[in-house]
Amino acid sequence: MKFIISRFLTKGVLVLVGMLAGSPLVFGDTIAIIGTGNVGGALGPQFATLGHNIIYGSREPDREDVQALVAQTGHNATAMLPVQAAAAADIVVMATKWAQAEVALKSLGDLAGKIVLDPNNAVHVDSSGKRHHAVATSAGQMIQDWVPNAMVVKAFNTLGAGTMANPESAGGPVTIPIAGNDPDAKAVIASLVTGIGFEVVDMGDISVSQVLEKMLVERGNANITFNYYFRPVPQ
């Protein structure tokens, strides 16, 4: 993590986030977006507006829809094979479907020292359309187990891709809760969250992913579509 932070800092940009005061918070460098569906297609263009280099990882990088996303993203975004994208990046966003996440993640090569942003939810939808948490722990914990030398941060799993792509469409503030074991990695992801227009709250270590993923289950089972907004109680 110190290597990533030092590379960011050489760009001479420092961004402060009140919720995580005292941590090194920065913008810059390369983000690999693994997956070009709704989530990848929402976050990639948003992160590009912050000055990040965006590389989309796709099994078919020359496919028409992938190249259309590259063009939409602008800011010199590119697309290449997932393993190439991950190798070139400091931050890897796992924007695949949950059912594909393990195979996709393990195909990326050595992710030691990289930040892995996990927006996944381990959710099962039954025959009635009701959503259920589908694993004993959480997607976040499982991903951290699969890449033990990477720094996994759970974020962006509690809202829809439409709101990710256009935060102003929410009609008011939206809170993105994050969780992870490495404070510096969480600080970097927090800077992404606030940079694109959301509020951020650090909820704790990666085990808290269980709570965050169940928040999405409850959102999906509600009779209305809503976004989360909350603040820590003043101490």
Q: Predicted regions span which residues?
A:
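Bacterial N-terminal signal peptides that target proteins for export
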Residues: 2-13
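Conserved N-terminal Rossmann-fold NAD(P) cofactor-binding segment
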Residues: 49-91, 95-103, 107-110
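Rossmann-fold NAD(P)-binding glycine/threonine-rich loop
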Residues: 120-153, 158-162, 167
